[in-house]
C-alpha cells in the first residue's frame, strides 16, 4: 500500500494495512475540545437568549452568573487547548497536523477537493481513500474550525476583557479588538455568529464521520478511539 506524500491518498492496489493516524495526545485533545465546544455552545446560546424565568430572585439564584462563569471557563479552556495543539504541544502524526496547515498551493490537493465534492454530489461513483482526512475535510476544518477558532477566540477574549473593565491588563491585551471592529456592539454579533458556525461544523463533522464509517472504504469513528485507520478490503475490490 502506497500513501501519497502530499494528499495522503491511499493506493490500495497492492493490498492494505492499518495506518496509525491519531496519536494518544491528539485523541485526548479531540475529546476535550468536543467537551469545551459543547459547553461554549450551550452557555453561549443561553447568553444570547436568556431564560425568561427562574425559580427565585436573580440575586439569590445567580443562574445567569453561573452560565457566564461556565462560558468563560469553557472559552479559556478551549483557547488553551487550541494554542497547545497549534504549537505542537499535543504532538501528532503528519495526518493530524495537516488540517492546521493544508497544502493550499498544491494543484493535486485541490483536485482531491473537487473529486470529493463531485462524489458527495453523486457525480462520481467513488472517491479515493486517504490515510488522514480527505482534502475536502481538511479544507472545511481549516476554514470553519481553525480560522473560525481564531475569530471566536479573539472576540471572546475581548468581550471577557470588557467584563473586567477598561483599566485592566485584560483590556490592555485585547482592547485592540474593539478598535479593529469599531466598538463592542460590533464585536458581540460576530462572536455570536461564530457560535452558529461551530454548530454547523459540529453537525457536519459528526454526520460525515458516521457516513464515512458506513459508506466509505476506511474506518473513521473507531480511529479516534484506537488511533488506527483500517481499510475495507471489499471496498477496494
Residue map of PLM features:
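Membrane-embedded alpha-helical bundles that constitute the cytochrome b-like, heme-associated redox core
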Residues: 1-237
Amino acid at each position: 500500500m502506497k500513501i501519497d506524500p502530499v494528499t495522503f491518498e491511499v493506493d490500495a492496489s497492492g493490498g492494505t494495512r492499518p495506518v496509525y493516524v491519531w496519536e494518544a495526545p491528539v485523541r485526548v485533545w479531540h475529546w476535550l475540545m468536543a467537551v469545551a465546544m459543547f459547553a461554549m455552545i450551550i452557555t453561549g446560546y443561553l447568553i444570547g437568549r436568556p431564560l425568561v424565568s427562574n425559580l427565585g430572585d436573580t440575586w439569590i439564584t445567580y443562574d445567569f452568573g453561573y452560565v457566564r462563569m461556565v462560558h468563560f471557563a469553557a472559552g479559556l479552556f478551549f483557547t488553551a487547548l487550541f494554542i497547545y495543539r497549534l504549537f505542537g504541544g499535543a504532538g501528532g502524526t503528519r495526518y493530524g497536523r495537516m488540517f492546521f496547515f493544508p497544502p493550499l498551493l498544491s494543484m493535486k490537493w485541490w483536485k482531491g477537493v473537487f473529486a470529493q465534492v463531485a462524489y458527495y454530489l453523486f457525480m462520481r461513483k467513488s472517491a479515493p481513500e486517504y490515510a488522514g482526512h480527505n482534502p475536502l475535510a481538511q479544507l472545511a476544518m481549516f476554514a470553519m474550525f481553525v480560522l473560525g477558532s481564531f475569530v471566536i477566540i479573539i472576540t471572546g477574549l475581548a468581550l471577557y476583557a470588557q467584563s473586567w473593565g477598561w483599566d485592566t491588563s485584560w483590556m490592555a491585551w485585547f482592547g485592540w479588538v474593539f478598535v479593529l471592529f469599531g466598538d463592542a456592539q460590533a464585536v458581540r454579533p460576530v462572536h455570536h455568529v461564530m457560535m452558529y458556525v461551530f454548530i454547523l461544523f459540529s453537525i457536519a463533522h459528526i454526520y460525515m464521520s458516521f457516513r464515512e464509517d458506513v459508506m466509505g472504504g476506511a474506518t473513521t469513528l473507531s480511529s479516534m478511539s484506537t488511533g488506527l485507520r483500517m481499510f475495507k478490503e471489499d471496498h477496494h475490490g
